[in-house]
Amino acid sequence: MAGRSGDRDEELLKAVRYIKILYQSNPYPKLEGTRKARRNRRRRWRARQRQIHQISERILSTCLGRLQEPVRLQLPLLEKLHINCSEDCGQGTEKGVGSPQISVESRAVLGSGTKE
């Protein structure tokens, strides 16, 4: 099993070469002809680009063995989020949600608010 990651790297490089060839096979349309003809060429070019992008995703997901859907990030409920601001908000008393608690010096970052 010593050479396994090298084999996988070779497969990935081969997949990237294939994807590069796909994108090179669809150059941007020429800027000649009537406005309608140019618009139609650009529309067809964008449709081909979308197809190439989808094919590229399928090639990479097959090569890397990744899932189609990204893993959903668990976010806290909006009702639980709040900004804790006492009478003197400029002293960096804001608290974040969760740990670690990070103090932010808002005056140092934002300045006094006047332009010189």
UniProtKB/Swiss-Prot annotation:
Signal peptide: none annotated. The keyword Cytoplasm does not apply. Belongs to the HIV-1 REV protein family. The RNA-binding motif binds to the RRE, a 240 bp stem-and-loop structure present in incompletely spliced viral pre-mRNAs. This region also contains the NLS which mediates nuclear localization via KPNB1 binding and, when the N-terminal sequence is present, nucleolar targeting. These overlapping functions prevent Rev bound to RRE from undesirable return to the nucleus. When Rev binds the RRE, the NLS becomes masked while the NES remains accessible. The leucine-rich NES mediates binding to human XPO1. GO terms for molecular function: DNA-binding transcription factor activity; RNA binding. It is found in: Host nucleus, Host nucleolus; Host cytoplasm. The modification Phosphoserine is found at residues 5, 99. One of its GO terms (cellular component) is host cell cytoplasm. A motif (Nuclear localization signal and RNA-binding (RRE)) lies at residues 34-50. Asymmetrically arginine dimethylated at one site by host PRMT6. Methylation impairs the RNA-binding activity and export of viral RNA from the nucleus to the cytoplasm. Phosphorylated by protein kinase CK2. Presence of, and maybe binding to the N-terminus of the regulatory beta subunit of CK2 is necessary for CK2-mediated Rev's phosphorylation. It comes from Human immunodeficiency virus type 1 group M subtype F2 (isolate MP257). The keyword RNA-binding applies. Residues 18-26 are annotated as: Homomultimerization. Keywords: AIDS, Host cytoplasm, Host nucleus, Host-virus interaction, Methylation, mRNA transport, Phosphoprotein, RNA-binding, Transport. GO terms for biological process: mRNA transport; viral process. Residues 90-116 are annotated as: Disordered. The lineage of its organism: Viruses, Riboviria, Pararnavirae, Artverviricota, Revtraviricetes. HIV-1 lineages are divided in three main groups, M (for Major), O (for Outlier), and N (for New, or Non-M, Non-O). The vast majority of strains found worldwide belong to the group M. Group O seems to be endemic to and largely confined to Cameroon and neighboring countries in West Central Africa, where these viruses represent a small minority of HIV-1 strains. The group N is represented by a limited number of isolates from Cameroonian persons. The group M is further subdivided in 9 clades or subtypes (A to D, F to H, J and K). This is Protein Rev. Homomultimer; when bound to the RRE. Multimeric assembly is essential for activity and may involve XPO1. Binds to human KPNB1, XPO1, TNPO1, RANBP5 and IPO7. Interacts with the viral Integrase. Interacts with human KHDRBS1. Interacts with human NAP1; this interaction decreases Rev multimerization and stimulates its activity. Interacts with human DEAD-box helicases DDX3 and DDX24; these interactions may serve for viral RNA export to the cytoplasm and packaging, respectively. Escorts unspliced or incompletely spliced viral pre-mRNAs (late transcripts) out of the nucleus of infected cells. These pre-mRNAs carry a recognition sequence called Rev responsive element (RRE) located in the env gene, that is not present in fully spliced viral mRNAs (early transcripts). This function is essential since most viral proteins are translated from unspliced or partially spliced pre-mRNAs which cannot exit the nucleus by the pathway used by fully processed cellular mRNAs. Rev itself is translated from a fully spliced mRNA that readily exits the nucleus. Transmembrane segments: none annotated. It comes from the Viruses. Its main location: host cell. A motif (Nuclear export signal and binding to XPO1) lies at residues 73-84. InterPro entries: REV_protein.
